[in-house]
Amino acid sequence: MARPLRALIFGRFQPFHLGHLKVTKWALEKFDELVLLVGMANESHTVLNPFTAGERIWMMREALKDEGVDLSRIITATVPTMSVYVGHAFYIINLVPKVDSIITRNPVIAQVFHDAGLEVIAPPEFDRNLYRGSYIRKLMLEDGNWRELVPKKVAAIIDEIGGVERLKKAASRD
């Protein structure tokens, strides 16, 4: 039995937004399976990383399911916060099921995974000025219209967990 063609998408997903969704759907047109790797999994309840790894996986799965994505094609994994260098790229490659490529627009991530032997594929840009976690979190803090930038299921989960309030509390710490 031939192994499926598989790619890695590595991100913090704080939160999982429409840009992530578009990249995931684009990648599923090219690969049999995707590994969605949640980075900085040990960090939460901060302005940079307000959501837990479990919440981020929940957001991804619900958004993808709502879009009709076959979740048997999606593998989720987590990795704690670590510095970016080729040794950690090898660690990650051995942490997840075998992958053929990494999909990233981050030049530093691209370089270390290239140095570790993976093919690097840059996805198309999907309105990166809008679909950026830092911008979405800023809108949350300012009571702006962040909901139009995330899948409906993600907005519902953020509401359910009190995510905006959590982010505001994290931002108000001295």
Curated annotation (Swiss-Prot):
Source superkingdom: Archaea
Pfam families linked: CTP_transf_like (PF01467)
Gene Ontology CC: cytoplasm
GO function terms (MF aspect): nicotinamide-nucleotide adenylyltransferase activity
Keywords for this protein: Nucleotidyltransferase, Transferase
GO biological processes: NAD biosynthetic process
InterPro entries from the UniProt entry: Cyt_trans-like, NMN_Atrans_arc, Rossmann-like_a/b/a_fold
Family according to the record: Belongs to the archaeal NMN adenylyltransferase family.
NCBIfam families to which the protein is assigned, alphabetical: cyt_tran_rel (TIGR00125), PRK01153.1 (NF002243)
Xref: PANTHER family: BIFUNCTIONAL NMN ADENYLYLTRANSFERASE_NUDIX HYDROLASE (PTHR21342:SF0), PHOSPHOPANTETHEINE ADENYLYLTRANSFERASE (PTHR21342)
Name this protein carries in UniProt: Uncharacterized protein AF_1488
